[in-house]
Amino acid sequence: NKKLINTVYNYKPDLLIYGHADLIKNSTLSYLKDNYKNLKIAQWFLDPLIKNGPDYFKNKSRILDKMEFTDANFITTSPDALNFLPKEKKCLFMPNPTDPSFEVLNNYENNHCSMDVFFALSHGVHRGILKKGKYDERADFVNRLVELTPNVKFDLYGIDNVQPIWADSFIKAISNSKMGVNLSRGEPIKYYSSDRITQLIGNGLLTFIHKN
């Protein structure tokens, strides 16, 4: 919190954007608002806000926690699908972004892919291994898809004790597939998708998502 206050003091920014800023106290944002009248504060929120989805109450609490100090909130779910957002606060939809410095592949130009369809899931962001005994309905869907399409070559991770992959290993894996499946946890909600969709589409894979 002291580092943030010192940074604002040194640079006098016009805009402060935060996301997953659990370590930043409300009192810090209040201080900045009081002492830098031209400072605008915005929140970027990319986690699921699905009632029957993963971590709903935790994510709901997190997005609301510092909203009293924000001038705008950018959310990867359509705000009109969320009935708990304060009406007086500016909340706007923002899709998960892609950037050519991260999404470096152009798989639509690759005529030598050894696999047809890529899919990966994990039990937590950058969690190296699967949790024992954890059930994920997406695995059922993908396994059924494999059964229905015996002539399709699937490259699957996070399913049937095949561990998740990250970073360079992830890029190398998707570089060998023509298509990708993007499945979000929980029931569909307007505009929301796992940010995996940007990694697949941004790297040039033909990408399949929920119909809803």
Task: Describe the function of each predicted region.
Residues N1-K3, Y11, H20, N26-S27, ...:
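Nucleotide-sugar donor-binding catalytic core of glycosyltransferases
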Residues I5-L16, N26-I41, K87:
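Glycosyltransferases and closely related glycan-assembly transferases
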